[in-house]
Every structure is written in C-alpha cells, then in structure tokens.
Amino acid sequence: MPLRLDIKRKLTARSDRVKSVDLHPTEPWMLASLYNGSVCVWNHETQTLVKTFEVCDLPVRAAKFVARKNWVVTGADDMQIRVFNYNTLERVHMFEAHSDYIRCIAVHPTQPFILTSSDDMLIKLWDWDKKWSCSQVFEGHTHYVMQIVINPKDNNQFASASLDRTIKVWQLGSSSPNFTLEGHEKGVNCIDYYSGGDKPYLISGADDRLVKIWDYQNKTCVQTLEGHAQNVSCASFHPELPIIITGSEDGTVRIWHSSTYRLESTLNYGMERVWCVASLRGSNNVALGYDEGSIIVKLGREEPAMSMDANGKIIWAKHSEVQQANLKAMGDAEIKDGERLPLAVKDMGSCEIYPQTIQHNPNGRFVVVCGDGEYIIYTAMALRNKSFGSAQEFAWAHDSSEYAIRESNSVVKIFKNFKEKKSFKPDFGAESIYGGFLLGVRSVNGLAFYDWENTELIRRIEIQPKHIFWSDSGELVCIATEESFFILKYLSEKVLAAQETHEGVTEDGIEDGFEVLGEIQEIVKTGLWVGDCFIYTSSVNRLNYYVGGEIVTIAHLDRTMYLLGYIPKDNRLYLGDKELNIVSYSLLVSVLEYQTAVMRRDFSMADKVLPTIPKEQRTRVAHFLEKQGFKQQALTVSTDPEHRFELALQLGELKIAYQLAVEAESEQKWKQLAELAISKCQFGLAQECLHHAQDYGGLLLLATASGNASMVNKLAEGAERDGKNNVAFMSYFLQGKLDACLELLIRTGRLPEAAFLARTYLPSQVSRVVKLWRENLSKVNQKAAESLADPTEYENLFPGLKEAFVVEEWVKETHADLWPAKQYPLVTPNEERNVMEEAKGFQPSRSAAQQELDGKPASPTPVIVTSQTANKEEKSLLELEVDLDNLEIEDIDTTDINLDEDILDD
C-alpha cells in the first residue's frame, strides 16, 4: 500500500538562485546561500527574513550552521572560508581554503572540525581549535568534488561525490580513500548516508539523471531510481521518515519510499531548477533550494507513534522498531515535574509496516499499528500478530473487542472479535472516523455519530472536527476543531427513549441526543478525560484541564508534548515528545474527584473527598468553588490568607476578615475592612481599622460625621505629629482653632498661605506673618521680597483693616466654645452673614490676654437667623426646635462606637 504522507508548505522565500540550504537544530531558522554572494536566515514560523550576511560579490555555494558555536560558516567562489557569529553578525574569521571554487562544507557533529571540498579536486580538514589550521588533505578525485557527507553511524568516516563519476569513502587520519564506488555514467553531484541502524546504505544522484542506492559494506548498487528528466542535483535519506528525497534540474522534487523504492509523490512548485535539499533529525521539515528562492515543506505528522495503557506500559515505534517501557519498573524513584523519566527500554521487534500511529484498545490487551495504508493488531504483551488488513483509518470502540476501519472514502466496516460484523456507507461519505462510545464519521457535510450496534444515526452536527475525545462514563465528549473545542453532554436516556418511540427523530438524527455545555476558543493538540475533567495540551504548549467552565493551567511546556495518559494511583499525568522522551506532572486525583463531585452537585461526596486533598492544593479547589458560585464553601476550604480575606469581604464576614487583617498587618486590608465595617454600621470597628491603616482622612470623615469634637481634637494632634498636615489643618479649622492653623502653616513653610489666612481670620497676626514671608523670600529673590506690603505700614492698601481688628476681638469673645450640633438649624449660614455689621458698636471689655488668664471665655452668643430665607422657614424651624429640646447628642448610645477612645494612643 502507498505511504500516506501529508505534505504542507510552511515557507516560500523568493530570492536569487539558492546554492545551499541548512536547518538550525534548535531555532526555527533556515539558512540559504545565494548565487549573488549573500547568505540569508529565514524564520519559517513567522515567515520573516531575520538575518542577512553580505559575504562577497561572487556565488556562495556552501553555508552551514555550527549551532554549538553560534556560527555560520560559508564557502564562496573567491576560495575563502568565512565564519560569522549569527547573533552579532560580526565576521569571526576568514581564510583562503582552496585554489578554486568551494563546493561543499561538512561540519563534524562532535569534533572542532569542518571538511571542505572544491573544484581544485581536494578535500581539506580544518580544526577551529587550532586557529583554523589545515589538519589533513584528501587527494584522489580527478574532477570537481561536488559534495561531502559524514557518516552518522561512524563520525570518522565520510563519503565524497565527484564529477569524475565516482563516489569515494574516506577515513579521518588516512589520506587515501577506503574504497571507490563506480556505476554512474556521468558526473556525481550529490550523496547522502542512510541514518537508520538497519541498512548500510548510501544514495547518490548524477548528471545521468539517475539516483542510485549503494550498500557500502558490500560495495554494490542495490537499486537505481529512474524518473527525473534532467540532471539530479540533490538526493537525501530523510532522518526520520522512511523516504528518499531527490531534486533535479527538471524543477521537480520526488519522494520515494525508502523500503519499497516506489515513487510516492512528485512536487513541482514552479521555481525552476532544484539545487539543494536539507532535513534534520527530530523534525519533519525539509528545506529546498531553487533558482527563484527556497521552500520549506512539512512531511507527515510530527506526533510520535506512541501509546500508554491504564497500567503504565508504554509502546512506541522508533522507525520500524517497536519498543516498550514500563512505568512500574521505576519503583519509588523520586519524580520531578517536567523532568525526563529514566525508563528502561525493551526492544519488542520490528514491524512489517512503517508505524505512523500506535494505539492501545480500552482494556490494554491489544495494540494497533497503522501506516502505509494498512493496520496490524498485536497483543500488547508479546507483540504477536492478531489481525491485519488494509485501511485508510482505524478507530477502537469503547467495547475493547470492537473496532472500525475506513476502507475508502465511502465505506466503513465494523469488526467484533476480529471478525467483520457490519459494513455500511455513510450518507455523505467518510473523510475520517473517530472511536469512543459512538462511532464518529466526518464528511464534507459535517460530523455524524452512529450506534456501534446497528449503525443507526444518532445525531448529525454541522462541524468539522479534528479530534473527538469521550469520557470513560460516556456522558461527556469533547469535539476539537481547528480553532476551538466544544464540550457536549450525551443524553443516553433520551436517545434510548427516542429510539423506542421514534419521537424527536429527524433526518439529522435525535434532536435531544446532545446538550452543549460550553465552547472554548483554544486549539487542542491532544487530550483525555479524567472523571468530568478534560485534560489537554494546547497549541501554545500549555498543559491545561477544563472543568465546569473553568480552565486551570497545570504547566507551561517548553516544547510540544503529547498526552499519553493519567495513572490515578500515582497522581501523575504522563506525556511524551517527538524524541520519545517521557515526562510527567503531578495532578491529584482527589482534586479532580472533588471538582467532579461539585460539578454534579454531589456535595456529600465532595465533603468525603475533601479531607484527602493536601493543604497546598486547597486554594486551587477554593478558586474553583468561587467560580462556581460557592463562595461560602470556598472560604472554608481556602488556605491562602489573601484569597480568604477577599472572600470574607465579599461575604461580609467581619470577624474572619478582622482576624486575617490582624495577621497580615497590611494598611490596604485595614482600609478595605473599614469600608465594609462602615457599610455594616460597625463604626467602632471602622475606627479601629482606620487607626491601624493610619487613614487620617477616613478618621476625620468618621469624626465629623458623628459630631465627635474630642475625636477631631485628638486627630488634629496625631495628624500633625505624623506629618499629615492637610488633615491636621482641617481638624484645627473645624474646631475654630485658627491660631493653631496659622502656626501649622508657618512651621511647614507655607508662608503665603499663612499670610492670606491671617488677613482673612487673624488680622492681628498679619504683620508678623508678612515679616516672616519677606525674610524667607529674600533668600531667593530680594526684589520680590521688598515688594511685599505690610498692612500695618500701608493701611491705605488694605481698607477696613482697623475694623477687622475689632471684628477679630468680637469673634474671640463671642465664639470661644463650639456650639452643640442641635443648634445647627438656628445658626445663620456663613454665606448669609455680615460680620462687620454684627460687630458694630462692640467695645472689648478686656484684652484677650486677660480673658486667657481668667480662663473664663464669654458664653457663645448664637446669631439667630434673620435672613429672608430663614424667615420663610421660621415656622418649621421652631417646630424642629421643639422636637430637639429633649434630644441631646450626648444621649445617643455610642457603646458600640467608642469614637473618642484611644484614637491615637499608639
């Protein structure tokens, strides 16, 4: 059967003629050397040109990455080898290597060597650790040496292809060739080694339009590939896939099966002659160089052929060899998340086909290997052949003895106990099939689910799935598309009822067969179910799980990984990469069981599971509960103080929030708790919280709102002591302590403001303040200081100043004490008063100093409302006054408030 090989173009880079290409082993870069003397580096993931080296004015026929040194090494027609640092773009070294055009460069995989070949018929070995000295010269060819390649299985051996129509195999340390292969009728342009361990083969391409496969141990030609219409310019064994890639001046790239030598595919991208090809171990990318640019194609799928059963036995294919590893053999070895597991690998033998996929059946007894359009079912223990056949696709049913194959684009067959049970043709054809509780068939029209037993249509859905994953219970299914994934619930009871009564059955199946639970805009690469939790790897290399509408990230992966399975007794999730490395991550089954129970609203089960969840995992569970709307349970479960505090605030749990705030000693938490306490009318608690938070602004608001003069007084002193000058000023001002306000402004250097305050409220102090202002300003600007006018010296500039002195004395005598809040309705608003008029005829009975000595300030004389506005409301105010007669602010019960106790004792 033909090799099923998907071919996808990843990059098209238009440029001058490309003479060589190379792929970087770790970065997504392609190196292309051009006939115009430049070397370009393209990023094939972003489709961008990232670096350019202007090497010379002549063709650069060879360029290679040396990743371990961050170098690009080039060879050109000016006979020079140049070495560039591809990070800094600087030229590290340059020397003349040959006496004619340099055709090829080969980098030794482990030693500090490069090999170069040239039109001077020589091959030279250079050692960069010895200042690029020439360590050896290999002579023997009688024409241009077109290509050299190092044997991947023996790094001391290399082969060369020459226009003298021969292939020579050499050994490092020996100046003469080990042997020569002859058979081409014209010059040989290219050569490559087979990297697998099963065949000692070489491939060559020549101007006779032929490709030859050689056994270099027997020194014989084992196969000749014909088909190209012009000179063969490049030929290569792919290091991963069972294919041979050849390119020719006829503009085509041909892909051949490396075992059957059958032509599998011919590529023609219309970019004229093909000159070079490059591939890389561990990657399915192939770079091609043409007259008009370069191309990268991706062959096949990079997902490894690998599968794990429920007991931890892993089977994978390495080329055609099948190997097994057992997680149980690791014993109690300490495992760290994301670290490669040191597994003992056991060879199980070779497979008759090249495995593209391997999959255990649900009970793990059998394993199916698919590839080359065929399938073989083996016993999982001994890899004994149980059944085989031709199929384009294979899918296991939930019943371990049942499976389906897609024989063609129109026929699907179902087998039970390895015998054909039923064959049917889906209505709209079959482009792909999916296993599980129902048989899924994708067609051009969408996805159809069929009953395994009778192939009856259950439901047709207009969707183009990429993967389908069923939960073990069969209740939930994930349908992953190219852009998102859907979580559906399979309603089996309604399906059975509809099948019996035939109600609700349409041409698209049973309408109530599925219920959509959610759609998530994320691309699923691989996935599996554990209970009601769907675990998956995403396109951005994240390991997540989805439960109840919430996505939880387990880990950020540093490379593409593929899910193998979950073993509950280990509480670990296992993944593999394309290099067949196995890693694991901790994922507690108790957490998944708890979340599953919550989703099913089975809280009795959730309560039983909760004690088995470790404390370090409780907060994750609490976040899940919070998102599901169970905040009270989340508060009980969470162990994170920050999370518990937020939940306590949301739930109005003042006691819990208070305890957490005491433990945290965070100003922010005290402020948040104060807001909650105020909203709950717990003013005593609010005062304590604001005090801990040193929130003087909040304390001032609380004190003024409650009319607590003593608290305002203490607050003023404390705020001034702690440098909260704005709050201190406002507190003094609210108490009418204008002298304290003035002194505060002077002490803090706010002399202009002090002068204006004195002019407005304390005219007797204005002269002193202006003098201070003038002295201070003179240090900066003498002229500006001299321009300040003292009101006592320039009375003509300050009309009404003398009257202001009288008013100041009048205010001091008549406003010595604060008025009770109950008199507020009887006091004229400031904006309606004329203090000058009120103080007319006032004669100070004694000086302010005498009053201060007596300590007996005059009783306050409230100014009864006489404004027009007040007269209109006189009746209502009198009624209000009657109501207030029996109400004293001191009579209010403040036992829970204690606003004036220990305000700032600390």
From Swiss-Prot:
User: What's the chief localization of this chain?
Assistant: cytoplasm
Source organism superkingdom: Eukaryota
GO terms classed as biological process: endoplasmic reticulum to Golgi vesicle-mediated transport; intra-Golgi vesicle-mediated transport; intracellular protein transport; retrograde vesicle-mediated transport, Golgi to endoplasmic reticulum
> What GO CC annotations are associated with the protein?
COPI vesicle coat; cytosol; Golgi apparatus; Golgi membrane
Question: Which parts of the sequence carry N6-acetyllysine?
Answer: 627
Swiss-Prot/TrEMBL keywords: Acetylation, Coiled coil, Cytoplasm, Cytoplasmic vesicle, ER-Golgi transport, Golgi apparatus, Membrane, Phosphoprotein, Protein transport, Repeat, Transport, WD repeat
InterPro entries linked: Beta-prop_COPA/B_2nd, Coatomer_complex_subunit, COPB2, G-protein_beta_WD-40_rep, TPR_COPA_B, WD40/YVTN_repeat-like_dom_sf, WD40_repeat_dom_sf, WD40_rpt
Q: Give the UniProt subcellular location, in the record's own words.
A: Cytoplasm, Cytosol; Golgi apparatus membrane; Cytoplasmic vesicle, COPI-coated vesicle membrane
Write down the membrane topology.
Peripheral membrane protein
Q: What is this protein called?
A: Coatomer subunit beta'
Q: Tell me the organism.
A: Bos taurus (Bovine)
Organism taxonomic ancestry: Eukaryota, Metazoa, Chordata, Craniata, Vertebrata
> Coding gene?
COPB2
